[in-house]
Structures are given as structure tokens and as C-alpha cells.
């Protein structure tokens, strides 16, 4: 699995090679052609016929020639119930007795019992949807909306009691829905409203007893999930109030932001910096690496000489000129004694020698690669003509080209993954195998000789349907390859 993941990650890289592109093309052609051969040989059709034919005699099992499909779609409106300040309310019924309401960042718990908490003498009496003295502004509208949804009419029904929001006991509103005396019709109407928006709730109050609804802020329980069907029931109960006092906001709005959440209407800008290289010819790490491997070269001695002198001058910049000269002479003595002696003997014998001044190398103009510089020999105080050491620089050029080809071959081998070669090999084997299957061919179904295909039914030896839908015709059957 790891090899496959690595192979997929390297696709943009190895497609830069022509050989890799050819391998990919051959693999794709073999795979596609192999699948076509498998389809044309009839093997798939025969397997489908043997597995499915005769399972059912219904006319609806297979529809030959029909291009319609039975499909379904499921809608989830939970995305609309987002955590915005003006969202559609969510309702929840937990354990059939605990009622909850949530809208925006405010959530409430609705309790129904017979315990009186608020009194008219000590608390606020309200008879309008303006609940500013009881709740905050972002809570006031949703509580008033919920009260109207269960059937309360502000201009006709009794007033409500609520605790002043400045008190430390907490926010609370109390509604009397007792079905007794003159309150019976009002109580039944609000009970029916609760039953409509909270389907399946259990009624804790009995006929003739005191029954109070208490609404107070509380955290939304974790076991309550967003259910848009309850929201639809809530909206259907308060259709008139929605049209007048509510506007749905920001359901399908979007904006571009950066990773920190700041608005970025213009999107992102991509800046690309480029480095400009000079035309200076440099002998880079390749030449240094060769010098580290092979020390018997005048050019490498000069590199070491320059390096030592540079470091000495940098370190002893404030030293006297005499100390610098002494140190320079000492460092220059590090040049290979063997080469110095050899060049001196050559000079005495009038044999070409090196004076560490002029060097030659073979440069490849297309790739910019070059050989390791070699000393240009001197004889009789004059440099040799290039034709005098023609064999040397021709041989050096051969070495350079061989080195370049070897390096290029190694790089190409490295850029051709083994997985790609395996895919190409096995796809070719797959194509060859399916080619033989296509030449052989398989029968795809059975039907009565000389008559049409009775798909999807499977026939017996008497020419009848095995499931009993059609009577035996006592006609011979034959296997056919195509319809």
C-alpha cells in the first residue's frame, strides 16, 4: 500500500520523461483494450445471466430497452439550523417530558408542573409580546414567538408573569394553562398547541388541577439533535406571525476569508520571486569533489593554494606584510613536492612542463558541464600548440561524454519507478489473456431455437420457464452469444 501511495505522489515527476509517458500510454491502452475484450467475449454477460436469470418471474425484474431508473433523494435541512443570531428555532423532546427550545445562541427549557413560582404582587405582569423587562433582546423575540406558536393571543388571553431579568434568581416566565373554571378553554388551546409542536409528549397535568408552564434559559442538552420536522410544525403553527414580524436571513450567503477569518473579497494573490544568475563561469562542487578524490593535479594544487591564501589573509588581515609573506611562502610549500620536482626535471630536460598559470578543459556547450581542468604545458618558455596534445583533449572529451551519458542513464533509471514497469508488464499480460478469451467467445444466454429471447427467464430442456410462468413449449433451446 505504501509503494502505491508513493507511486501516486510521484506521477507529476516521472511524467516529465518521454519513456515514462510511453509506459503509461502502453499500460492504459492494454488495460482499456483488455476490458473491451472481456466485455466482447461474453464472460460477464454469461455470469450475470446464470446468477440473475430465473430468480423471479416478475415482469419488473429486468426492463430490456428501458432507460428509466427508480431513484430517491433525502433532504437534510440541518445546515439551515446554524449557530447564527437569527436562525430558525429548533425544538427537542427528551424522555417525552422535557421540552427544549433553541434559536441562535439562546436555548430554553420548558417545564410543566403545578408548582407556583411567580406571583403577581412580586413579579412583572406582561400582556404584550414586549418582554424586554424579562429577557435580553436576542432572547425576547424567540420566547414571544414560541408563546404565540402554542396558541396564546396577546390581545384576548390572560396576561403572563415573568421575573425581572435584573434579579439574581435567573430569568423565568410563567404561564397558567390550568383547565379549570374560566381558564378551561385557554388551557385546552395551549395544550393542543404543545401537542402539535412536541409530538409524543406526555401530559403531566390532569383535568381540574393547577398546571403551569415555566420557561427559563438553560444549555441545550447534548442528546438533542437538530430535527427540521419539529421546526416545520412550529412554523405552521405561527404562520401569521412569520409573515408579519420575521424575516429569514443569511441562509445562502458566503464570503471569501483568509485562514484567520478576515474578509478577503479579492481572494488570494500569488507572488513569484525569481533569481537572476550571472554569466560568470564557475567551477563548482563537481570540480572540488574530483580534487578531493585525486590529488595529483596541478589545478587542484592551485585551488588549495588559493584557498589557503584567502583564509590566511582573512585571518591575519591586521598582521604585518612580512608575516603575511612568510605565511604565504609556508602555505605555498604545501603544493605537492612530487609535482614540483617532476616539473623541474622536465624543464631541465627540455620536456614540456607546467608553470601553474594556464589550464585547459573540455566544455560541453549544451549542458554546461566540463572536465577537470588540466595544466597547459610549456616547452622552451612557450605554451604548446593545442594540436600537440590533441590526443589528450580528445580523450578527455570522450571521458566527459561517457560520464554525462552514465549520469543521465542513472537519473533516468531513478525517474522510472519499478511500480510503473510492473503495471506495464501485467497490463500487457492482461491484454494478451483477454485477447484469447475474445477469440474463443462465450455464450451469453439461452433461448428457444428460431424465436426471440425470453429474458429474464431461465428455460428448461422443454423450452418452458423454470419458474412456471410459461408452459413448456416442447421446443429445442440453444445457447446464443448475443441478443
From Swiss-Prot:
Zn(2+) 1 binds at residues 57, 457, 465, 467. InterPro entries: Arena_glycoprot, Arena_glycoprot_zinc-bd. Zn(2+) 2 binds at residues 445, 447, 453, 483. GO terms for molecular function: metal ion binding. One of its GO terms (cellular component) is viral envelope. The keyword Lipoprotein applies. Specific enzymatic cleavages in vivo yield mature proteins. GP-C polyprotein is cleaved in the endoplasmic reticulum by the host protease MBTPS1. Only cleaved glycoprotein is incorporated into virions. Residues 2-17, 54-58, 59-422 are extracellular. The cytoplasmic domain of GP2 plays a role in ER location. It also contains a zinc-binding domain that allows SSP retention in the GPC complex by accepting a cysteine from SSP as the fourth ligand. This is Pre-glycoprotein polyprotein GP complex. It comes from Tacaribe virus (strain TRVL 11598) (TCRV). The gene is GPC.
